[in-house]
């Protein structure tokens, strides 16, 4: 059964992963975000309770 011989298939697997790992990461890392996140304030905003007139 030739499909059980790992010699050609293993090299194809290794070379395809080498191609993916050398081409795709630079393309993905080249993307820039449209807006950088700004650091949020550590102070909690002052919230006041509001009476709901239920009756």
From Swiss-Prot:
Region of interest (Disordered), ranges: 34-55
Transmembrane helix is among the record's keywords: yes
Bias type Polar residues, positions: 38-55
Keywords carried by this UniProt record: ATP synthesis, CF(0), Hydrogen ion transport, Ion transport, Membrane, Mitochondrion, Transmembrane, Transmembrane helix, Transport
GO terms of molecular function: proton transmembrane transporter activity
Residues that span the membrane, as ranges: 4-24
GO CC, alphabetical: mitochondrial membrane; proton-transporting ATP synthase complex
Chief location of this protein within or outside the cell: mitochondrion
UniProt subcellular location: Mitochondrion membrane
Pfam families xref list: ATP-synt_8
Gene Ontology BP terms: proton motive force-driven ATP synthesis
Record membrane topology: Single-pass membrane protein
Signal sequence, renumbered to the chain: none
Subunit-structure text: Component of the ATP synthase complex composed at least of ATP5F1A/subunit alpha, ATP5F1B/subunit beta, ATP5MC1/subunit c (homooctomer), MT-ATP6/subunit a, MT-ATP8/subunit 8, ATP5ME/subunit e, ATP5MF/subunit f, ATP5MG/subunit g, ATP5MK/subunit k, ATP5MJ/subunit j, ATP5F1C/subunit gamma, ATP5F1D/subunit delta, ATP5F1E/subunit epsilon, ATP5PF/subunit F6, ATP5PB/subunit b, ATP5PD/subunit d, ATP5PO/subunit OSCP.
Primary role: Subunit 8, of the mitochondrial membrane ATP synthase complex (F(1)F(0) ATP synthase or Complex V) that produces ATP from ADP in the presence of a proton gradient across the membrane which is generated by electron transport complexes of the respiratory chain. ATP synthase complex consist of a soluble F(1) head domain - the catalytic core - and a membrane F(1) domain - the membrane proton channel. These two domains are linked by a central stalk rotating inside the F(1) region and a stationary peripheral stalk.
Family: Belongs to the ATPase protein 8 family.
PANTHER family (alphabetical): ATP SYNTHASE PROTEIN 8 (PTHR39937:SF1)
Protein's recorded name: ATP synthase F(0) complex subunit 8
Species of origin: Paralichthys olivaceus (Bastard halibut)
Gene: mt-atp8
């Amino acid at each position: 059964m030739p499909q059980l011989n790992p010699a050609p298939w293993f090299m194809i697997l290794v070379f395809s992963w080498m191609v993916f790992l050398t081409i795709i990461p630079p393309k993905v890392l080249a993307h820039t975000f449209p807006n950088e996140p700004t650091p949020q304030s550590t102070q909690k905003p002052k919230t006041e309770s509001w009476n709901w007139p239920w009756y």
